[in-house]
Amino acid sequence: MKQYLNTVISNPRPAQALGINQPFVVFCFITSRALSFVPAIYWCFKCLHLAFVADKFKWLPLTSALWTLVSAYLSFVLANGFLLKWLIHYSIGPTIIRLFSLNVINFSFLSLSVSFITHGDNAYLLPAWIAISCFQTAAYIVQDWITSPIIRTLPFRSSSSSSSNYRHNLDFLEITVFAVVPVGIASFFTMVMLIWQLYKYPDSFLVSA
């Protein structure tokens, strides 16, 4: 946990590799990356509040809160990946502007997705956040493919490299660790909660229908 916390509040590794260590710039990078998961964390607390005040079907807001955490994590790794690409292609100022613009887009995407899928009914928060997390997982896979040449050539930015260094490929190990595993863990616990609900209240879904 301490390692992940240090990752959030420390200078991003791409900036360190490029020798960017100005305090104000580092503060902007840290702030923009932290803002990436604020919307999902807000919905996490909202789901936990719904679980606290609910008389039954507490598993729905609880599992929804779990998926919001998955979305928050994916939002962070997406912002970190865009930071890597933009630092290579743009100067510091445009990169910071793009990062904050990305947070605005992320906030709008999450808000509109939840509103469109749930139509104001909190009972649909779980499928909404599952859909959001799956979309973000697909976006991370595309981003990993796009930034794959940058990752290989980053330490040798000023040197000439062979054309093979600029070929796009997918790092399946990285995708599995950073995208598939979080979604898989959340899916497992969602399935367990659903089975528990069916076992304890076998007629609950018939009644709710």
UniProtKB/Swiss-Prot annotation:
Parts of the chain on the Cytoplasmic side: 46-63, 120-121, 196-209
Question: Where does the record place it?
Answer: Endoplasmic reticulum membrane
Protein task: Involved in N-glycosylation.
**Lumenal topology ranges:** 1-22, 85-98, 143-174
Family per record:
Belongs to the EOS1 family.
Matching Pfam families, A to Z?
A: EOS1
Its placement in the membrane is given as:
Multi-pass membrane protein
Q: What is this protein called?
A: N-glycosylation protein eos1
